[in-house]
Amino acid sequence: MKFSPALQSATLILRYKRFLADVVTPAGEHLTLHCPNTGAMTGCATPGDTVWYSTSENLKRKYAHTWEITETQQGAFICVNTQRANQLVKEAIATHTIPELTGYGSIKGEVKYGEEGSRIDFMLQADDRPECYIEVKSVTLADRDNGYFPDAVTLRGQKHLRELMSVAATGKRAVLLFAVLHSAIERFSPARHIDPKYAQLLNEAQKQGVEILAYKAELSADNMTLKSTLPVVL
């Protein structure tokens, strides 16, 4: 996924009200960016970090600029725009980058399913195999080279795990794919210290046939590509 037009850089002053961030450009201009991330963004929003942002041509938008990537003062790249995770996964499926998800002729997004009124991120279909339901989660929380999800208690994430277990029980494929969007992360685990219920459900889901994958993106200010699988440590 190549950013076009190219992203612009600025220095982070402050993220606030979850959806807003104040930055200053190299030319000294102060801007307010839209922050497309509802999470805690721990370690992703330290004042002084470099922010890479895109600019919309939609004149109706209140905030024309969107925070896409953080380049930390330690040199790590982190994609904070959670919408990019699904785009990366869709691209990776289409280019056969994820071996576990090859062999399907049809890919559909945002399909209604489950008993709790959910929408699955992707559903893959083929004539010769069961349907494959894929839920995507974005991973940006890091402690050294360990990556964790979630970065805050997530009742929605717990619901998705229950829905995936129900899918697996019918004989269809249920896949939970963690898109790791932090360049320093080398392995993935559930954030038991933040949301123990989610960690418990993730273990239960694996035992009940839900496939758990973690794939890491190669990140820069120019482009992003889902590249390599990472070990999952439950």
Swiss-Prot record:
It holds the Pfam family SfsA. Coiled coil: none annotated. Gene3D superfamilies: 2.40.50.580, 3.40.1350.60. GO terms for molecular function: DNA binding. PANTHER family: SUGAR FERMENTATION STIMULATION PROTEIN A. Belongs to the SfsA family. HAMAP family: SfsA. This is Sugar fermentation stimulation protein homolog. It comes from Enterobacter sp. (strain 638).
